[in-house]
Structure formats: C-alpha cells, structure tokens
Regions:
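Short, glycine/acidic-enriched loop or turn micro-motifs at the edges of active sites
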Residues: 12-14, 118, 155
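Acidic, divalent-metal-coordinating active-site segment for phosphoryl/phosphodiester hydrolysis
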Residues: 148-161
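A short, structured active-site edge motif that brings together acidic residues
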Residues: 111-123
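Acidic two-metal-ion nuclease catalytic site recognized across multiple nuclease folds
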Residues: 161-231
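Conserved non-catalytic scaffold segment of RNase H-like nuclease domains
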Residues: 1-111, 125-147, 173
Length: 231
C-alpha cells in the first residue's frame, strides 16, 4: 500500500471535459498514511450551473459567484500535487478534466495514478454496483457529503486503504500506479446551422456578443446558444 499519495475528486458542470467545466476541486495529501494537507476550492465557471448539477452536488451559482477563475485554482492545484501519485474513483474522469483545464492555460499535467473503481471491478466482481457510494456503504465508510469534491476524495482514500488491506497481497499488480493518459481532441468548428441559429438569436434578443463566426468552436457556439435561450 502506498503511504504517500494524493486522493482527489472534481465536481463539474457536465461529463465532457472539452465542453464542460470544473466547479470544485477537493484533494488530500497523504504522508505516511495520514492526511498532511488539504485542498478545497471552488472555481468560478464561465457559464451558469444547471439545476441538475446543483441537485446532484448541492453547489449553487451563488456559492461560486466569488470563486477564483480556473487558471488560478488549477495552477495552485498542480503545485499542490507535486510529484505524487493520484488516486481517484474512476480517476480517468477527474484526470481528463484536470488535463484539459491545465492545457487550456498552457500547463502540463502528466501523472501516475491508481483507480479504486478498476480495483473494485476486479476484486469485487460479485457486487452489483461499484460506485463510490455503494462501496462506501459496503465497507461502512462514512462520507458526510457525497458528490462534494473533498468529501469524495477523503472517502476514496479510505476506500483505497480498505481495498489494499483485503486484496493487495492477493493481486499486487492491481495496486501498482500506471501512467494516466487522456488525448485532448482538437476542438471542432461550429456548424453552419449553429452559426445561423446563433445569428438569429442575437438579432431576436437584441444583444451584442463579441464572437467570430470563423473561429468559434462547436462547444462555444452551443454554450452561447444555451445562454441566450436561458436569457
């Protein structure tokens, strides 16, 4: 079992790291098996948080209104991580968002990691659900605030220690850190239909937007359309 690592989790506005944003990062730095430092911070998104995300996470637009922008928070988190191994539950999801966020500001985020979800899928194949909540319930691990980044990260650290206690000796390869990978896809240009619809909305709403139809991406156009429709 690793004695030093970082367990982390992010809360986001959706599932696509190229189109959605991180709104909260939670992490704990473990040294010699004990929590040595904590990282908990909101990020102010460029778009409003949907009611569905608020219902899931409890994070409201008011809670992030005074938060720092992505570039500042992500840079601080990268410094916090140092050279540590990252541990997460479905860590590829959290890593994909962190990598895209870092890349957007010209920063590199290359990490080794351990995924408690993958460990559980192999070691506990008989369990119907391998979600963090289900595994915490199975092992009686308390998670005071599920779907909030720091509390999920803390629960993940406890789950990792529990799984290592029961299964690492039987299958040590399952617990070895691997290189985390995520290939950032090149943004796709907005479709002619999106541009036409966006122009029509701008005329109807009588608003002024600073945008270039020749360079706007598909995801940016979708976000602008959503914001105009909500308004």
């Amino acid at each position: 079992m690793l004695k030093s690592y970082i367990a982390f989790d992010v809360e986001t506005t959706g599932l696509n790291p190229l189109e959605n944003e991180i709104i909260e990062i939670g992490a704990l730095k473990v040294r010699n098996g004990k929590v040595a430092e904590r990282f908990m911070e909101f990020i102010k998104p460029t778009t409003s948080i949907s009611p569905a995300i608020t219902s899931l996470t409890g994070i409201t637009n008011e809670m992030v209104a005074e938060a720092r922008p992505r570039c500042s928070v992500v840079a601080d988190f990268l410094d916090f991580c140092e050279d540590d191994v990252l541990i997460g539950h479905n860590v590829s999801f959290d890593y994909s968002f962190m990598k895209c966020s870092a890349a957007a500001d010209g920063l590199s985020f290359e990490k080794m990691g351990i995924d408690t979800l993958k460990i559980a899928q192999k070691a506990l194949s008989g369990l119907e659900s391998k979600s963090l909540g289900s595994l915490c319930e199975y092992y009686h691990i308390e998670n005071k605030s599920a779907h909030r980044a720091y509390h999920d990260a803390l629960a993940t650290a406890k789950l990792y220690q529990t799984l290592a206690h029961y299964f690492e000796e039987k299958d040590p390869k399952l617990f070895k850190p691997i290189q985390l990978t995520y290939k950032i896809k090149k943004p796709q240009p907005a479709t002619p239909k999106q541009i036409a619809f966006l122009n029509n909305l701008i005329r109807k709403k009588r608003v002024k937007l600073s945008w270039d139809p020749d360079t706007v991406t598909r995801s940016e156009a979708s976000r602008m359309i959503d914001d105009l429709l909500k308004g």
